[in-house]
Swiss-Prot record:
It catalyses: a 6-O-methyl-2'-deoxyguanosine in DNA + L-cysteinyl-[protein] = S-methyl-L-cysteinyl-[protein] + a 2'-deoxyguanosine in DNA; a 4-O-methyl-thymidine in DNA + L-cysteinyl-[protein] = a thymidine in DNA + S-methyl-L-cysteinyl-[protein]. This is Probable methylated-DNA--protein-cysteine methyltransferase. InterPro entries: MethylDNA_cys_MeTrfase_AS, MethylDNA_cys_MeTrfase_DNA-bd, MethylDNA_cys_MeTrfase_DNAb, MGMT_N_sf, WH-like_DNA-bd_sf. The lineage of its organism: Viruses, Varidnaviria, Bamfordvirae, Nucleocytoviricota, Megaviricetes. One of its GO terms (molecular function) is methylated-DNA-[protein]-cysteine S-methyltransferase activity.
Amino acid sequence: MKIEIIETKIGLVKIIYDDTQTKIISVMFIDSSKIKPVKNSLSGLHKYFKGQNDYFTNLDLELKGTPFQRKVWKQILEIPFGETRTYSDIAMAIGNPKAVRAVANACGANPIAIIVPCHRVVGKNNDGGYEYGLEKKLWLLDFEKKNTQ
């Protein structure tokens, strides 16, 4: 399913498509006061990609996952822009030093990429996977490094 929000002269319209994006499931007007957090997120993403590191403030995230995953993601939110931590660092920080593999799995299940910056979590040799491909992870890390100097 794909959701698209379009700003029109008479208000915001939400369109929901099927998985193949060939059929429209729903079209409806939405109350713009209900999507303020979405606008904050979009503004934050624009700031992020301009290299500003005050990009995500006052966001109310709904982290849907297991209690362990949410604990990992909350810890990852603490990693500063331009820095990295290892999977082991995160496991130790949440009080479960043997859960390195589980931390890696939680990173792979992160539903809020970039905002919950799992790309900042690396293996001991500065490697590790990324749900959206290693090329994107390396680009994000390099981008952040360049914008902290």
